[in-house]
Structures are given as C-alpha cells and as structure tokens.
Design a protein with these regions (language model features):
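Active-site microenvironments that recognize anionic phosphate/pyrophosphate groups
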Residues: 1-113, 128-131, 148-291
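Helix-hairpin-helix/helix-loop-helix acidic hairpins
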Residues: 108-109, 118-121
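Active-site beta-strand/loop microenvironment that shapes enzyme catalytic pockets
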Residues: 120-154
Length: 291
C-alpha cells in the first residue's frame, strides 16, 4: 500500500498538497473519562464537514465517487470484488483510503464485505458512516480505512475488551458499561473468534449492533483485525447526524461528527472552532449525536 500511496502522491498535485499539509496539522487533547479525545485543525476537511446532504443538493451535483466523475489522477485498486480502494485526497491521517462500491447505490445497511477488507488491510480499521451518521456522500455506498492506532476509541476497546482464554468460540459482546468504562461515546464491541462458530454468528451482527440503527442509517461501524489477529467489530449507534451547535453563526461550531470523530478525533476545519472548543462542548456534541 505504501507504493500505491507514493505513486498517487507523485502524480496528483491536489492530494500531494493536502498530505503534505498534514505535517502542519495542529491538535489539542482532552481527557474525557477514560477516552483521550483529540481535536484536529484541518481546513481541507471543509469539503466533508460542510457538505450539503439534502436530496436536492445531492441531485444537483455529479457523484464524486462514480468512476466517470473522479479526477483522472485518482487511480483505483480492486481490493474486494465490487469495491475499489482509492486514496482519499482530503486526508485526516497520513494513511487514509476511501473504498467505494463499483456500482452507484445508496449508503445503506452494513456492508459485510468490510470483514474481507479488514483482512486485506492489516493494521488498519475499515469504517462506515451511516447515511445519517456522518456520510458526506450518502448516495454512493462507500467505506474508509485508516491506521487503527490513530483511533483512540479502538485502542481503548482493544485494551479493555479482551478474549479470555476460557472463551474459545463464537462471538463476545460488550458495551462501555459492561467494560466498566467511563466513555463519552456509547458503543457495542464485538469480538469474533476465528472459527466456524464465530463466522456463523456474523450472520447476526446487525441484531447485535442494533438493526434499528443500521436500517435508519444512524450508526458508525468499525471493523479491524487486532494485533493478535482477532476480528473486531464496533458499532456506535446514533440519534442524530449533527449536533444542535452545528453551523457558522455565533456560538456555533462547524463540527459534523462521522466515524473518526466518534472514535475520538474531532475534526475542525475552522481555526476559531479549533481554538474555542471546550471539554463541555465536546461532551455536549457526543451526548446530542450519540446514544
């Protein structure tokens, strides 16, 4: 994958400039309960954070994930049947991919192909924004992938939700409460054992995470293989797409939480928001959009 990234950056000036800008990215940190939350100042992400996602706006613009509308420099890699891996030209982290469906179809359901993607991307977490949970392109099915160590919530869950030696088969499920965590983000953590029983139980994953939230597009889903090769799936159910404070007016913040924000890295494209966000503001944002 490093060769793919290098090749894209050498031939694509826009992406190269945005990845180089990451080296100057500013960040603040807050300890909120057991979760260390980062706030990143990233002006390039205004494309996503400020995206208009109403039906009229979507219909009025060409879909930027369809192959015919992509920049000519954006070269796809067929990662899993029916899916193409693309370098994200507006990155949050130094390794940041978009994985788009080869066919234009809505951002719906739980794409179980994410499990195979995670197998193909060791060290990375594949994540999915529900259409009402941070998706800036809800008319075209897609996932994204970043390095797992960049996501505080995933690191915390790996540390606290472990597969016991006595638990040898199937699926193990825990919430923040079950794990004794003081987390501003509610979640359902699933460990899938690498055997037939575990694979069979994957068929019930929607019920485990919350079928209602998946059907309503109010969920963020994360899939990865941990450091010992165990498959992990985390669902973060949502009750809102954006907090009441979303906007550009006085006392408002241009913060539109997607998976990365819910995983503990809040993206702020405006400097004023980056500098003025407080721990109470962050708690409020999480409480208004999460469960």
């Amino acid at each position: 994958m490093l060769e793919f990234i290098d090749s894209q950056l050498s031939s694509w000036p826009l992406a190269r400039a945005n990845y180089q800008a990451l080296g100057k990215t500013e960040r603040r940190s807050f300890e909120i309960g057991d979760l260390r939350v980062g706030v990143q100042f990233n002006p390039a992400r205004i494309v996503s954070t400020g995206a208009r996602i109403d039906a009229v706006s979507l219909a009025a613009r060409p879909c930027f994930l369809c192959s015919e509308n992509r920049p000519p420099e954006q070269t796809p890699v067929d990662i899993v049947e029916g899916w193409q891996l693309l370098l994200n030209p507006y990155p949050i982290f130094p390794t940041h991919f978009t994985i788009a469906s080869s066919v234009h179809r809505p951002q719906e359901g739980f794409p179980l192909d994410m499990v195979e993607m995670a197998e193909k991307l060791p060290g990375m977490t594949v994540f999915f924004n529900g259409r009402h949970a941070g998706a800036s392109c809800p008319d075209h099915l897609h996932c994204q992938a970043v390095m797992t160590h960049e996501l505080p919530l995933m690191c915390l869950i790996e540390e606290r939700h472990k597969l016991l030696s006595s638990e040898t088969s199937g699926m193990r499920v825990a919430t923040a409460v079950d794990l004794g965590l003081d987390s501003p983000v509610g979640f359902v953590s699933v460990i899938v054992t690498p055997d037939m029983d575990g694979m069979r139980q994957l068929a019930r994953i929607e019920e485990t995470i919350g079928k209602k939230y998946i059907e309503e597009g109010l969920v963020n889903i994360f899939v990865w293989k941990d450091s010992v090769g165990i498959l992990r799936i985390v669902g973060v159910p949502r009750k809102a797409h954006r907090p009441s404070s979303y906007g550009t007016g006085i006392g408002q913040y241009l913060v539109s939480p997607g998976s990365i924000d819910m995983a503990g890295v809040i993206i702020t494209p405006r400097r004023d928001d980056f500098e003025s966000l407080t721990i109470d503001d962050i708690r409020r944002i999480y409480s208004e959009v999460g469960i």
